[in-house]
Amino acid sequence: MPNLDDILSVAPGVISRESDGELVVVLPEQGKFVVLNGTGAEVFQLLDGQRSLSEIAVVLSERYEVPLEQAQTDVLALARKLLDRGAVRVSSE
Amino acid sequence: MTEFNWTFAVGGLSLSLAGPAAWVEPFARAWASWADESLGWVVRLVQDETLPAPQKPFFGARPRFVDGRCLLEVPGFAGEIAPEDETARLRAHPAAEPGDLAYFVRTAFALQAFDADTLLFHAAGVVHRDAAYALFGHSGSGKTTASRLSSGKPVLSDDLVLLRPSVSGWEVWATPFGRQRASQQVRSAPLRALLRLVQAPEERLEPMPRAAALGELAANSPVINADPVRSAALLARWDGVLRSVPVYFLHFRKSNAFWEVIDAQLG
């Protein structure tokens, strides 16, 4: 279960491609994929192994003018989904 | 032990099998109509009694990519495909089944096809009114069923087809890899549409979002979707296909009435 202090990065071998405003994330090791919509795609691209989930939530909160708490909830939910699928990994805590 | 060499070609791509007659001759018999004499990749099959007896079918081996080579290793089998050298070599216990050997040949062919700018695609290919429809979906989605329901129409394959670019667009080519025998008269046709199978109580076509289609098509690209090096190019290639042909969900029952829906919307 990720927390807001976690720093996530894209798992090795995972690739992505934008298509019609959505991001297709392919997990070669599993032969599976995840499709992310606009906001999800932005979060995925911010998972650069440098920023914490908390910092990413701040970016989204400011960019979309949504309450920080809402942005944190959304970022954590997406992080959980991506960790479950093996698309990202925790770099450090 | 008698050695035997035999070459076949799919969509203009040749692949030569070399190995014990007992292992190669069954391919020559089963795939006789695919025989060819061109030079192409070489797949060498080697019996190795020092390997442990197979515990499971080779089909369960996941391709692993190391230093540009594709490795398939499970007890009883040690396969290595070297795309740069255009060669592949499988050492297998003598108890290996023909299906195990065919799996390795198919894996080598998937890499050969991709490196020749084509795509081996987990889909059934059915020709209707001189155009090919590629029916895809997860295992059990109905590829074989839909092929069997398409009576009177040439079936290019019920499991794996080759997509090849041409000056006028993408073509679907038959392969010998399916369970159902491919048409001997019709070996290719221009690709008209990609149809994602959905078993349903009625027949209808529904446009499929392109991002979801891209993901599913990549997931249905055997071997290549397991290669971190080729995966980006795989997505780009499928993106190119999706820019030239439409993709739909095909909701269908166990009847051939879905062709009427296809005619009404795409005919």
Residue positions per predicted region:
Chain B
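A noncatalytic interaction/capping subdomain that flanks phosphate/NTP-handling catalytic cores
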Residues: 1-139, 149-156, 161-267
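Conserved glycine(s) of the Walker
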Residues: 141-143
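Hydrophobic positions on the alpha1 helix immediately C-terminal to the Walker A/P-loop
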Residues: 146
